[in-house]
Amino acid sequence: MNQDYMKTKPILPLVLSMSLPMVLSMLVNSLYNIVDSFFVARISENAMNALSLVFPIQNLITAIAVGFGVGVNAVIAFYLGTEDHKKAEDSMAQGLLLSAIHGIILMVVCVVFIPNFLKFFTNDPVVLKDGILYGRIAFSFSFVIQVGIAFEKIYQSLGRMALTMKIMIIGCVTNIILDPILIFGLGPIPAMGIAGAAVATGIGQTVPFILYLYYYKVDLPLRIHKEALESTQYYKKLYGIGIPATLNIALPSVLISVLNAILISYSAIYVVVLGIYYKLQTFVFMPSNGIIQGIRPLVGYNYGAKEYDRINKIYKLTLCLSLIIMIAGTLLCFVFPKEIMGLFTKNKETLDAGVIALRIISISFVFSSLSLTSGGVLEGLGMGIPSLIISLCRYVVIILPCAYILSSLLGPTGVWHAFWITEVFTAVISLLIYKKKKKDSFNL
C-alpha cells in the first residue's frame, strides 16, 4: 500500500484528483436533498413544514456520522503518513466499532423523543403527525448511516475518492428514483405520502452500507483484527478530533432550531423559507465541502510526513477554489431567486418572503469560504478545538444574539441579515486562528 503520491505529486493536480470526485458526489447528494424537498412540497405545505422541522435532527444524525468519520479519517491518514500500518488498522477497527454503537443509541433516542421535539415548535396536528411518521422511519436507519459513513471516510483516508464517489452516487440515485414512486405510488405500489419519502431515504442510505461491506471483503487494504476491537487505545485520539468535528457539523441543527423558534413567532411561512434555504444552501456549499473532504487526508498525510510547506500550499489553493464557487452561488441567488424558490413552493407569501431571504443571506457566501477552508485544514491537522471555535462563532456565539436583536428591530428580515454579518466577523477570526496554529505547529 503506497500513498507516497500524497507528498510528491504537484499540488494542483493532486488536490483536483482528490477533490473532484468528492465535489461530484456531494453535488449529487445535494440534488437528492432538493429533489426530496421538491416531491414532498407536492404533497402539501404541511408536509414541507414537517420535513423542515425534522431536518435538524436528521442533520444531527448525519453530523455525528460525518464528524466522527472525520476523526477516523484524520487518524488513519496521519499514521499512513508516518508509515505505521498497524496503528492505521487498529484505529480503523475501533472507529468502526464506535460508529456502530453511535448508530444504535441514536436510533433509539431519536425514535422515542421525536414527538416531544416537534411539539416544541408546533401544535398543528397534521404537521405533528407527518413529522412523527417521517422522523421515526428515517431515524430507524441510523445504524447504517453511522457505519456506512465511517467506511466512506476510511476509503477517503486511503485516497480512494473515486470509489466513494461511485457508491455515494448509487445511493443518491436510488433515493431519487424511489422518491416519486413511493410518495405518489406506481402500478401495484401504493402511494405512501411523506412516509414514502422517508423509506426512499432509508433505502438510499442502506445501499451504500451494503456496498461498503462488499468492498471491505474484496478490496480494503486495511483489516479489522479482534485484538484491536478489544482495546480502547485510540478512543481518545478518535474522539479528540471526532467530537469537535461532530459539533462543527451539528451546530447548524442547533442554529436552525433556535431560528425556527424566533421565526415561528411571526409566521410558519418563515420556518418553511428557512427550511427551503438550508436545502438550497446545501447545494451551494457542497462543492466547497467536497473539496474540503478531498484535502483532509492530504493534510493529515503530509502532516505525518512533516511536509509543512505543502500543507500551506494546499490551504491557499483550496481557499481560491472555494471563493470561485461561492461567488457563483451568490450571483445565482441574486439573479434568479424567484425561479429557485419557485421550485419548492407555489404559495405567493412564501415565495415573496423566500426571494428576500435568499438575496440577503447569499451575501454571506463569499465570506464563509475563509471559515470553511480554515476549519477543514485544521481538522485535517487533527486540531479539532480551533476548528470548533470557528464553527461556534458561525453558528452560536455571533449569529444567535445578532438574529435575536435584529429580529426585534427589523422583524424576520433581521434574521436574514444576521447571516452575512456573522460571516464577516467569523472570516476575520478564522484567518487569525489559522495563522496562529500554522506558526505554532510548523513555523510557516
Q: What is each PLM-predicted segment?
A:
Residues 60-63, 107, 175-180, 209-213, ...:
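Hydrophobic transmembrane alpha-helices of multi-pass small-molecule transporters
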Residues 6-38, 42-43, 59-71, 75, ...:
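N-terminal transmembrane alpha-helices
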Residues 27, 31-49, 118-125, 181-192, ...:
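Helix-terminus/linker motif at the lipid-water interface of multi-pass membrane proteins
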Residues 17-36, 137, 171, 204-208, ...:
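Transmembrane helical elements of multi-pass membrane transporters/channels
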Residues 22, 26, 38, 74, ...:
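Transmembrane alpha-helix boundary and packing residues in multipass membrane permease domains
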Residues 48-108, 112, 145-164, 260, ...:
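Small-residue-rich hydrophobic transmembrane alpha-helices
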Residues 1-19, 76-143, 189-243, 299-364, ...:
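Short alpha-helical transmembrane segments in multi-pass integral membrane proteins
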Residues 69, 138-156, 164-172, 197-210, ...:
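Short runs within selected transmembrane alpha-helices of multi-pass transporters and secretion channels
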